[in-house]
Amino acid sequence: MVRPINAEEDVTSMWVKFHESLNPIRSSLIKQEECYKTVDGDDNPIEERIKACDAGIQTSEEQKKELEHTMQSLEMIINVLEKANEKPVITNSPLTRSRRNRGTSFTANTVTFTPGMSVAFKLPYTRHNEGGDWIQCIIIKVTGEGAKQRFEVQDPEPDDDGNAGQIYKTTANHLIQIPAKGTPLPPISPKTNVLARYPETTTFYRAEVIRTLPDGSCKLRFEGEEEVGKETVVERHLVLEYNG
């Protein structure tokens, strides 16, 4: 029995339970495949094929119920994340010089990072990773205050086995807020260096702004683009001003 999601839980627990809810669906798909093979087998007795057909129908009905529960859980998670992104808490303190050198988000004020907020996260340096890459993550936990404040962020993309995305521990210096889609944002001047999410990925790369389009999106030239002179259009809220 999959544990139901409670709206008062933290995002981590909600994601874990959501992935657990996918297991019965995977099992039912395997059962359906077995039923299909039996029904499709011309050499199988007719009684066995009819029995497999009935079992397949029953499995489909069970799968429908599981999918309904899963969709409800996913909608609850989305609602929590949307609320967190729609109402960020912002203080009036200006960024310190050291923080500004590391990177700034769409506002000149210090952002108060909260659970559920979407952020660009700078991957740490490890033996297997040279570091410096930025990926889209979700803040799932905040501890401490002031200089001792720490964050846990999670990659929203599940791994190849369908498990929940990796969780990282970090500080505010390695985070940039990603504004919610539809947030009014000022245009960015041509030739400005930015971090932007490359289309169809969750990774942010350095780019140069060519111009802002009438719909507010930005036409960019990404650093290291294989196709020489290629220009790419990216939605404005996924283009982050960055001086790093």
Swiss-Prot record:
InterPro entries (UniProt xref): SGF29, SGF29_tudor-like_dom, Tudor_SGF29_rpt1, Tudor_SGF29_rpt2
Residue stretches making up the SGF29 C-terminal domain: 109-244
Organism: Schizosaccharomyces pombe (strain 972 / ATCC 24843)
Parts forming coiled coils: none
Domain of life: Eukaryota
The name this protein goes by in its record: SAGA complex subunit Sgf29
Record bears the keyword Transcription regulation: yes
Its biological purpose: Chromatin reader component of the transcription coactivator SAGA complex. SAGA acts as a general cofactor required for essentially all RNA polymerase II transcription. At the promoters, SAGA is required for transcription pre-initiation complex (PIC) recruitment. It influences RNA polymerase II transcriptional activity through different activities such as TBP interaction (via core/TAF module) and promoter selectivity, interaction with transcription activators (via Tra1/SPT module), and chromatin modification through histone acetylation (via HAT module) and deubiquitination (via DUB module).
Region (Histone H3K4me3 binding): 222-225
Family: Belongs to the SGF29 family.
Complex formation: Component of the 1.8 MDa SAGA (Spt-Ada-Gcn5 acetyltransferase) complex, which is composed of 19 subunits tra1, spt7, taf5, ngg1/ada3, sgf73, spt20, spt8, taf12, taf6, hfi1/ada1, ubp8, gcn5, ada2, spt3, sgf29, taf10, taf9, sgf11 and sus1.
Membrane-spanning segments: none
GO molecular function list: methylated histone binding
